[in-house]
Structures are given as C-alpha cells and as structure tokens.
Amino acid sequence: MKNLSSAQIRQMWLDFWKSKGHSVEPSANLVPVNDPTLLWINSGVATLKKYFDGSVIPDNPRITNAQKSIRTNDIENVGKTARHHTMFEMLGNFSIGDYFRDEAIEWGFELLTSPEWFAFPKDKLYMTYYPDDMDSYNRWIALGVEPSHLIPLEDNFWEIGAGPSGPDTEIFFDRGTDFDPENIGIRLLEEDIENDRYIEIWNIVLSQFNADPAVPRSEYKELPNKNIDTGAGLERLAAIFQGAKTNFETDLFLPIIREVEKISGKTYDQDGDNMSFKVIADHIRALSFAIGDGALPGNEGRGYVLRRLLRRASMHGQRLGITEPFLYKLVETVGNIMESYYPEVLEKRAFIEKIVKSEEESFARTIHTGSQFAEQLMDKLAAEGKSEIDGRDIFKLYDTYGFQVELTEELAEHRGMTLDIAGFEAAMKEQQDRARASVVKGGSMGMQNETLAAITEESTFVYGQTALEASLSVIVADNARTEAVSEGQALLVFDQTPFYAEMGGQVADHGFVKNATGDIVATVIDVQKAPNGQPLHTVELSASISVGQTYTLEIETKRRKGVEKNHTATHLLHAALHNIIGEHATQAGSLNEQDFLRFDFTHFEAVTAEELRRIEEEVNEQIWNAIPVVTVETDIDTAKEMGAMALFGEKYGKEVRVVTIGDYSVELCGGTHVGNTAEIGIFKILKEEGIGSGTRRIIAVTGREAFLAYRDQEDALKEVAATIKSPQIKEVPNKVESLAQQVRDLQKENAALKEKAAAAAAGDVFKNVKDANGIRYIASQVQVSDAGALRTFADNWKQKDYSDVLVLVAAIGDKVNVLVASKSSDVHAGNLIKVLAPIVAGRGGGKPDMAMAGGSDASAIQTLLNSVADNL
C-alpha cells in the first residue's frame, strides 16, 4: 500500500476531482460569515449551504474542497481516543443538481482503488448503506464489491431539520485483526460497535429529498435538483496511509508532540498513557487556526471555546511538568506542518503567538484568583453552617478558573468539606448538551425555492444612475411566476435597474416604479439578489403591472446619498483601525444605513478612549483633505497587485470593483460611494462596545447626523454647567473635579469615624479576657451589620496580644453568625467551631487559625458563650 504524506493525500484528492470537472473551492474561514446558526465552520459542506438550498447558483455545479473545520461538542474525549479532534480537515466533493448516485459511487471507488490514485486493496474496503436504498447496493455490486462487504444500516439516512436529505453510503477501511483483540469481526460494523478495526474514511450523502418534519419520511418530496455531499477525514486517511496506530502518530500531529517532548523533558510512548501529549497537540492546532482566522479567547461564544481549549491544554502541560507558558512556542510548528495549503498560520504567527502567550499568562493569574474564590466560597459555606460544596460551584471553578475536580477536592478536604459530585456532573452534562444542540441547530440547509432558482432572465445593475427606463422581465407573486399583478406584494426583475441590491453591508435602495404617464404603480421596499444573481425588487403595488412593459425606476436619492456617505466613511474607518490598533483589526461585519454606520472588527480588548480619539481624528483628516473616491473595474489579480483589501468570506468573481481613496484606502467593494471624501462632511463615533468574544463594534454617524450628535452633547454640557453653577462651559471640568474632591474628602472622613467607632467597640470587647485551663480567651456577643464586620474585629484582635482565643457571636437578621480565631497551637479554630455551632442550630468549619459558622437559634447565644470555657 502507498505511503503518502498528509499534503500528498490532500493534493491527490483535489487533483482527482479536478479531473472529473470539479472546481476547487478554497478553504473558508473557520468563523462563519453571514451564518448566525453556526458557531464554527464544522464540515466541508457548511460553507456551501447557499448552493444546496438554492439561494445562490454556483458557476460550476461540481465542487471539491479541503475545508478546515472545528467541532467542540466532545472536548472531554480529545486525547482519550485515537480519532477525536477539535480541529480537523474534511475533504469533500459536491454536486449541485448535476451528477448523482451512479457517478458519485463509481468515481469514489475509482479514487480509492485505482493504482493511479489511492490504490487501497479492494478487499480492505467495506460499505454500509440504507436498507431501502437498493440502487446504491446494486451500484457497489456492479463495481465488483463482494456482497459480504456491504452492510445495511437503518442509521444511514442523513437529515437534520427541514431541507435537503437522503440516504448515505459510508466507506470503511479494515485495519485487520491486530485492531480487533476480541476477534469480533464484521459484527463491529453490523451492530455499530465502537472499534479501531473498521475505520470510517468517507461518507457519501445522496441528497434527493426535501425533508419536512411534519410528514413521514416516505412522503418527503423529491428535490428539483438532486445533490451529492461527501466528506472524508484527512486525519484518518493519513493514519491509514502512514501505518499509524492513531491519528496522533501521523505527520499532522507528531511534529507537535516532538516539540512538547523537548519542552517537557518527557517521552511520548505510543503504547502508554499519552493523553496530555495528544490534548496539547490537538488543541494548539485549533487555537492557531481559529485565532489566525480572527476568533479570540473570551468568556462567551467561540471565544469561550478557545479559552477552554487553551486552559485544558495548559493544565495538561502542568501534568507533564511544564510550569511556564509554552503553548505559544508550538504555533510555528503548526504553521510549518500546514504551510503548503494553509500559509495563513505562518503569515500571522507573531499575532497568534502574542494572543496565546497572553492567555497563558492570564490563566496563571486566574488560577491564583480561583484559589481566592474557592477560599471565600468555603468561608461563606462555613458561615452558613454548610459543609458540602454545591456542584454548580465546583463546575464554575472547573469551567471559569480551570480547576480540575481533584484540585477542588484537595482544598475542600483541608477545610473538612465534601463535594457534590452528582451536581457537578449534571452541570457538565448541561453544558455538553448545549454544545451539541448548537451543532444540530446549524445543520439544516433550508428548503429549496424552485421558483426563484428557475429565474434565468438577465438583469443589470447600472452604477451611477438614480432613474432609468427598464423592461419588466419577471413577476413572482405568491411564490409563482405570473404575467401580471395588480395588488399586494410581488417580486420583480427588470432587464436593468438603478436599485442597489443589499450586499456587502450596504442596505438596499428604496424608491418607486412609474408607468408611462408618470404615475406610481409600485413602491420598492427591498432589493435582494436572486439565486442566479439578478436584483430582485420587493414591491407594494398600487396599480396593475405586466411583464414586457417598460417602466421608469426611480430611487430615493436622499437615502442613497446618506448610505454612500456612511459606506465611504466605513472604508476610512477600516483603514484608520489598521493604522492605529493593528492589522489584525479586520472587518467582521458592517451595516451602512442612511443615518448611521455600524462596523464590527476583530480585536482582543476594548479600544481605549485615546485610540478612539485618534481614529476619529484620522478619519476626519481624510474627509477634510477632500480626496477623490475612484472606482475601477479590473480582474482579481490586478486588484491584488494594487494592494486591494479583500474581505474574508466575500466571494469575488474574475472581474471586481476596486474603490481607492487616494493612497489611504484600497478595497474590493461592489457598493456605491461618494465622489469625494469632502461630501461626508464630518465623522463622529457614538459608541464602541464588545459584541462577542474577540469582536468589537463601532457605531458612528456622518454629515447632518454627526452635527446633531455634537449639538446634543453641547446641550447636555450646558445643562451640567447650569446645575453646578458654572457660567463658563470651559470651567465645567474643573468645577466637577472640585466637587468630586469634596465628596472624596467627606467619604474619607466618614470612613475614619466608622473606623474610630469600630476600634472603640473592639476595645470594649477585648477588655473582657477570661482564662480556662491556662488559655486566655475572649467570648462576646457584638452588634454588627454583616459577617464581614466580624472578620474586621478578628483582624484588629490579631494586631495585639489580647488573648489566645477569640469567640464572637452576632445576631444578624434571623441568622446567627459565629467566628472563632486562635493564636494557640493547642486550639484548632475549625475544630472548636464544629463543637460550638450546633448550640445555635448551625454548622461550620475552617482553618486552625480562623473559622466561621452560621446558625438559626439566637436564643442560645448566651449558652454558646458560656460553653466556650468547657471546650478549651
């Protein structure tokens, strides 16, 4: 059998499908673009949904790709098994309404068995199929597959929600009896038993039905265009071709493991327990690619996933004896492994390393903070008379602070407490269920719209026009084409139009359709792209219209001009962000409306007030410089030579439009813009905020809206000036600072008085010293507002040699709080409070020098105080 590198496998896959007329789709960004249903791109087909649901018609219906993907619903299994990964590559071939079952199976078999390609031994291949799908069974038989190698399975039907669905046929490679120690054989496949012998290497989904959850599967309607969707895991193929026991011994992971060996001084043993090596190798791949694609560690969404991966890998580093940040040192190795197809990791290496190292250092601090949280939590439980740490708190320590359960258990044991393990496991399961639900949620491809997909009439958007005459080509009403319509809403396609269809963050034009006499026959309320790319006008009708007639199309020029100002300002803002906070601040979304703009970008922290001031100033400088805005149409290669910034996730054809603003900004953009930056007038940032982990948002206004914003601020300042009696606005800051200082002085004076009163009260308490068995003790009831005040008493007591033991009791509301502090080696505060607390119907515990408890029987306080001497 051939011995192929992962790069050779990937390239051979793409070359084979190119030979069958497929276009190679580049691997998309791991962060989904315009798809809120997905947290990550999690399969090869995830980026092609627009083709499968018919909302966009591809240039070539035959597509192949190698797609980097992330799935995180089973993070805890990574490192425990031979094949679980967070980041992996899915090789795929796809047919959008072109070839179907016969070609997909025949070509798949050719790729796998032909000496020119993969050259797998035929007797090593097994296939599963849906029992009712005899067409697939017969096709495999016709290709020479033995019936004993064809296994019917009821689970071989692919459907997730409404949308394309159908039977699938899976291909397995038999690794032999060495991987079947109990000699179970083919039953491993027949009974779907988890095993390392029969490895699934490819799944071919025959998408031929529109799934409808409201009807039985037997009543699903056939798709107007049948599709093929396949996926083969590169890591599994590499393990087979390279004779590796697990995926981790392939050229995709082993170089990373070797680097970890150097850093840790430990050795990776293929037959031993190497979970930590595997976790680190897997997680740093996912981290490197995800951060390179613009995702950043944080506390929610995909940022939370990255933070969890990094902390899990870091903890496993500690198990290998690594005490310093080290993950960032592995980024270069990841980049070197993947450079042939994914150069972006090495290109962004410095930035990725910076983020990873910063997170590692932050995690070290978090571990310290987590220890403090745990101590405070146990103090609180002791004060409340509880001795078990709730499962949700254990999970918080695990999830937020990176505390393994064993570490929490050790801390609890020192305080005489136990763990609610069942509650912890329930909280863990809830999180895993949420993760799995989010994956399922994003699976549906959506129902195909046959009517819109069938529109093939040509239509052209005419730049620079606000009104023109056009012939009406298509009317769609009630999801069906018609020749005429007179009321309600309809979708219209003209042979040409001045109306901009919503795209690239620019909202659609609004306006009117007029007849030959100048009467309005329809109001345009939206314009979107049809599946074949034509501008599709949504209109509300006020008169009858007919296909073939000529109409005048007029846009609302005021709306268009406002949108253009904001769109050009967005380009200026994007360039300013690059200049001031870094090249990593790339566009993650935008919205250019008539009266404001919204710009989302990748950044790992809040933009400072000083940075915002500089950004605003730089954008306005470009506006005041009155720079011409020039748009040229050219080919994509020339555009790249011009230095045009392409937005990741946007699909560009061979011909593109390049918008240049002097030498300040050059971007690929299909939108409309002002002719000169001076038309924008003025630019003002209203708000900067985080909208998700690693993503920031700026909301800004231009022109008249910016003037109104400044005026509102001036009015507010005048109101403040009047309130504080400052006749000159310029004196307001000094006057406010003077008032603030007065408040600080009063607060300081108040705190001093409270401290003096507390000291006086403590002095009275500390005077009442008694003796029991040679141990000096103070036992007293005090009047305080909260349990924290008891600790303040104890802190004051520690400063001087008042006594050996201090026992304080306070009735706060309907609860009794007890504190025991000890300086004596003969008295353990935690043990003493366990004896005293039950007297007031409470429980507690703590350290040898300090312990707290909580109770509910205030009537027994004096009894508790009287019993102190008997227990010393």
Swiss-Prot record:
Q: Where does Zn(2+) bind?
A: H567, H571, C669, H673
Cofactor binding note from Swiss-Prot or TrEMBL: Binds 1 zinc ion per subunit.
The Gene Ontology CC terms held by the record are:
cytosol
User: What catalytic activity does the UniProt entry give for this protein?
Assistant: tRNA(Ala) + L-alanine + ATP = L-alanyl-tRNA(Ala) + AMP + diphosphate
Where are its TM segments located? none
Q: Where in the cell is it found?
A: Cytoplasm
Q: What is its EC number?
A: 6.1.1.7
Give the record's keywords alphabetically: Aminoacyl-tRNA synthetase, ATP-binding, Cytoplasm, Ligase, Metal-binding, Nucleotide-binding, Protein biosynthesis, RNA-binding, tRNA-binding, Zinc
- Which cofactors does the annotated protein need, by name? Zn(2+)
Its chief place of residence is: cytoplasm
Q: Which SUPFAM superfamilies match?
A: Class II aaRS and biotin synthetases, Putative anticodon-binding domain of alanyl-tRNA synthetase (AlaRS), ThrRS/AlaRS common domain, Translation proteins
Recorded GO molecular functions are: alanine-tRNA ligase activity; aminoacyl-tRNA deacylase activity; ATP binding; catalytic activity, acting on a protein; transferase activity; tRNA binding; zinc ion binding
Q: Which Pfam families match?
A: DHHA1, tRNA-synt_2c, tRNA_SAD
The UniProt entry's GO biological process terms, in alphabetical order, are:
alanyl-tRNA aminoacylation
Q: Which family does it belong to?
A: Belongs to the class-II aminoacyl-tRNA synthetase family.
About its domains, the entry says: Consists of three domains; the N-terminal catalytic domain, the editing domain and the C-terminal C-Ala domain. The editing domain removes incorrectly charged amino acids, while the C-Ala domain, along with tRNA(Ala), serves as a bridge to cooperatively bring together the editing and aminoacylation centers thus stimulating deacylation of misacylated tRNAs.
Role of this protein = Catalyzes the attachment of alanine to tRNA(Ala) in a two-step reaction: alanine is first activated by ATP to form Ala-AMP and then transferred to the acceptor end of tRNA(Ala). Also edits incorrectly charged Ser-tRNA(Ala) and Gly-tRNA(Ala) via its editing domain.
**UniProt-recorded name of the protein:** Alanine--tRNA ligase
Q: Which organism is it from?
A: Streptococcus suis (strain 05ZYH33)
